[in-house]
C-alpha cells in the first residue's frame, strides 16, 4: 500500500510564500506531496523558483503536482475554448519546469453540447490533443534539456481530469471514467468532496469507498489514484464551498478505514483541498495511523484467541462468542448501575447528629477550631 498526503498549495504555516519554501515545510511535517496552484506563464522572475522546486522534487523523491486553471470552458465557443487552452498551455510549461507528476484540469460547463455522447466525445478529443502536447514538450528534439534531467530520464506528466462538484458542469464520475477509458495518458482525479456533493452525501461508510475504488479499477484497470479531499457544504446535489473536514458531514475516518483494511492494492495520492491545507493533511495522516493501530489491536486479539483455543481445545468461534456475550453483559451492567447507585441517605438523622454535637459548652466549641468530621462540607470535592 502506498499513500502520499499533502496540501493544495504552500502551507498556511510557511513563513515564506515560494514553492520551494513550501516544499521544505511539507517535508518537515512528514508529508510527501504537494499540488502547486501557480499556473501563470513562466516569466524570468518565476523561472528560477520553479526550476529549484523541480530540482528539489527530483532529488528528494518528492511528488510534485500542479493544478490548472479553475475556470475553463473547453465545451464553450471557439473563443472561450481557445482562451482556456492558452491558460492550460501555461500550466503544461510550468509542469515541465517543476517536474509535476500529475496535472489536474477542469472541463467547465456543458455549453451547447448538453449531457451525453457528443459532449464526452468532444472532451475526449480535446484531452487527446492536450496529452499529445505534453509529450511534445517532454520530448522536444531541438533541446537536450540540460537543466531538466527528469525530462530525459522520466515520463511525461499524466493529465488528470477532475470530477466536478456541480450538476451544470461536465465531470460526473461516469463521464470522467468514460473519457479516461478512451484517452491514453489521462487519469481520473477523484475529488471526494465533489463526488459526495453530487451524490447528495453518498460517501458515508468504508463500504462506499470500496464501491467507488472498485468501480474505477474495474472500469479502467488502474491501481493508481489521484484524489482531492476536504470537507464540503452542499445543497441539492451541488457543492457550495469547501470546509475543514471536522465541520462537514463528509468524514475522513471511513476512507482511512478502507485504505488500511482493504486498500492494500492502492497507490494513492491524497491532496488536502481544505481551507486548513496542511493541518487537515496531517489530520488525515493521523486518522490513517489510528486505523492502522486498530487493525494491529484486532489482529493481536485474534492471535490470542487462536492460541487460547489451541490450549483449551475450544474453537475460535466459541471463544469469540463468549467474549461477545461477556462484553454484552458488561455493557448491560454499566447501564443498570446508575439506577442502583442513588440510595437515599438519612440526611435528617445526620443533621440531628450535627445538632447534638453542637450542644456541648461554648469552651468546647472554641477549642475545636479544626474539625476532622467526615461530614464537613469543606472536604467534599
Predicted regions and their residues:
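N-terminal pre-domain/capping segments
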Residues: 1-93, 187, 297-338, 357-362, ...
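Hydrophobic faces of well-ordered beta-strands that scaffold small-molecule active sites
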Residues: 3-9, 34-36, 64-68, 103-105, ...
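Active-site beta-loop-alpha junctions enriched in small/polar residues
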Residues: 8-12, 37-41, 69-73, 108-110, ...
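C-terminal helical cap(s) of enzyme catalytic domains, especially alpha/beta-barrels
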Residues: 278-293
